């Protein structure tokens, strides 16, 4: 299955609308995410490794905000515990439809994967050993994030983990500027124009709300996790593991 090149913001837009995961984005998503998020491929592959370590026999693994299912496929390829399954959730019908097509191409279906089109805030989390929020929490209204993490913590087995990847913010203006400028340089190096960078930033401004690492660690502790550890960071993108 071929994927198109992202050119959604290549031409000047008459009217800027908030970013959404519609059919246009789905068609170019693999290209968009690889060219926009530094270290994305490494994050995906290592989520598979972490999931393999902490998946427990007879449990569920959740991929919340699964988009096209890259995390689910990475977990599926690594998990060896018996009677595990993966529940992948996204609220975009277009994402789920394309994700199911990609899932069907996987030639080694060792772990069952169920892709569900639903609001992840309304999906029951139960008997879980691994839960992944890979660049998902940042799209949840900040006031609702703690409640979601509390539900995840409650649904995890003892010894289970939450893997949380996010675009992050920095409290000091100098550090914020440092990381933002390098991220923009990364996107330019991957072929995005200044117009594309500017227009996408405007489209995401009210939709994607990043927070500091300290904020994430504090919220995870408040949700009941015993500890959280930063395992990956490249510029203003990071991933943490939180242990129950």
Swiss-Prot record:
Homodimer. It is an enzyme of class 2 (transferase). S-adenosyl-L-methionine binds at residues 40, 65-67, 90-91, 119-120, 134, 201. Belongs to the class I-like SAM-binding methyltransferase superfamily. Cx-SAM synthase family. One of its GO terms (molecular function) is S-adenosyl-L-methionine binding. One of its GO terms (biological process) is tRNA wobble uridine modification. Keywords: S-adenosyl-L-methionine, Transferase. It catalyses: prephenate + S-adenosyl-L-methionine = carboxy-S-adenosyl-L-methionine + 3-phenylpyruvate + H2O. It comes from Geobacter metallireducens (strain ATCC 53774 / DSM 7210 / GS-15). SUPFAM superfamilies: S-adenosyl-L-methionine-dependent methyltransferases. Coiled coil: none annotated. This is Carboxy-S-adenosyl-L-methionine synthase. Gene3D superfamilies: Vaccinia Virus protein VP39 (3.40.50.150). PANTHER family: CARBOXY-S-ADENOSYL-L-METHIONINE SYNTHASE, TRANS-ACONITATE 2-METHYLTRANSFERASE-RELATED.
